[in-house]
């Protein structure tokens, strides 16, 4: 089976031949100083297309929120995986991302024939896999996974903001912004902060 996803800037993606069920996998949250790295795996239904899939970062919040339930409803299977802040500190962010991706794929209620991973590294998997640079723009399954992962993590940051409103998590989503740095300097770190990340280590005096 050969499918193509067209992009104005990138070459069309040629799906590997000889496979039927493709899972797209993407992550959100490698860069933030707080919270989990969240991954999603999605197997789309070719007979039930979803309009408007692209890299989640290129969509408005409103559009992501509209696509989120549509993907959940129309996909053949979808699953979330995650590594919490303490796991990131133990493993490092790259390895934690790989583990979270493994968890997302393992959670699918349909086993894919092939995993398409956004980026340039494939975790150890029980099926064939391929890393796709800019995959969230080139591969519909990865686009869908990026939307599921981002909406999920953004909602978690909004919940964390309710518990710790002084940090502004709903606005910066835990990323290393000036406002976040200032909040850490003033209020210290919380249990969800990643202690292995340099800005957090600096505040803790363990650099």
From Swiss-Prot:
GO function term, MF aspect, one:
RNA binding
Classify the source by domain of life.
Bacteria
Q: Which reaction does it catalyse?
A: Endonucleolytic cleavage to 5'-phosphomonoester
Question: Which residue range or ranges hold the RNase H type-2 domain?
Answer: 20-207
BP GO annotations: DNA replication, removal of RNA primer; mismatch repair
User: What is its EC class?
Assistant: hydrolase
Please list the coiled coil stretches.
none
Q: Where does a divalent metal cation bind?
A: 26-27, 118
Keyword Transcription listed? The answer is no
Q: Entry's SUPFAM superfamilies?
A: Ribonuclease H-like (SSF53098)
Cofactor note text: Manganese or magnesium. Binds 1 divalent metal ion per monomer in the absence of substrate. May bind a second metal ion after substrate binding.
Please classify the protein's predominant subcellular localization into one broad category: cytoplasm
* Cofactor or coenzyme needed: Mn(2+); Mg(2+)
Give one Pfam hit by family name.
RNase_HII
Q: Which PROSITE patterns match?
A: RNASE_H_2
Q: Name one GO cellular component term.
A: cytoplasm
Q: Which UniProt keywords apply?
A: Cytoplasm, Endonuclease, Hydrolase, Manganese, Metal-binding, Nuclease
EC assignment: the record states 3.1.26.4
Localization per Swiss-Prot or TrEMBL: Cytoplasm
The protein's matches in NCBIfam families, at most eight in alphabetical order, are given as: PRK00015.1-1, PRK00015.1-3, PRK00015.1-4
Q: What does this protein do?
A: Endonuclease that specifically degrades the RNA of RNA-DNA hybrids.
- Record-linked PANTHER family: RIBONUCLEASE H2 SUBUNIT A, RIBONUCLEASE HII
Give the record's family classification: Belongs to the RNase HII family.
* Protein name as it appears in the record: Ribonuclease HII
> To which species is this protein native?
Aliivibrio fischeri (strain MJ11)
The beginning of the lineage is: Bacteria, Pseudomonadati, Pseudomonadota, Gammaproteobacteria, Vibrionales
Query: Per UniProt, what is the name of the gene that codes for the protein in this document?
Result: rnhB
């Amino acid at each position: 089976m050969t499918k193509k996803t067209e992009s104005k800037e990138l070459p069309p993606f040629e799906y590997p031949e000889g496979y039927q069920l493709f899972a797209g996998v993407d992550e959100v949250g490698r860069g933030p100083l707080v919270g989990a790295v969240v991954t999603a795996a999605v197997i789309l239904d070719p007979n039930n297309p979803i309009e408007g899939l692209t890299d989640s970062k290129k969509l408005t919040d409103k559009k992501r929120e509209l696509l989120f339930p549509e993907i959940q409803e129309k996909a053949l299977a979808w699953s979330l995986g995650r590594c919490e802040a303490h796991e990131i500190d133990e493993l490092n962010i790259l390895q934690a991302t790989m583990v979270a991706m493994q968890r997302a794929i393992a959670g699918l209620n349909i086993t894919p024939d092939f995993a398409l991973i956004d980026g340039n590294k494939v975790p150890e998997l029980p099926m064939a896999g391929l890393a796709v640079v800019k995959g969230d723009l080139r591969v519909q399954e990865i686009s869908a996974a990026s939307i599921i992962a981002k909406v999920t993590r953004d909602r978690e940051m909004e919940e964390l903001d309710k518990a710790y409103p002084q940090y502004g998590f709903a606005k910066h989503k835990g990323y290393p912004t000036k406002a976040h740095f200032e909040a850490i300097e003033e209020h210290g770190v919380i249990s969800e902060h990643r202690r292995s990340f340099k800005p957090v280590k600096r505040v803790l005096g363990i650099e």
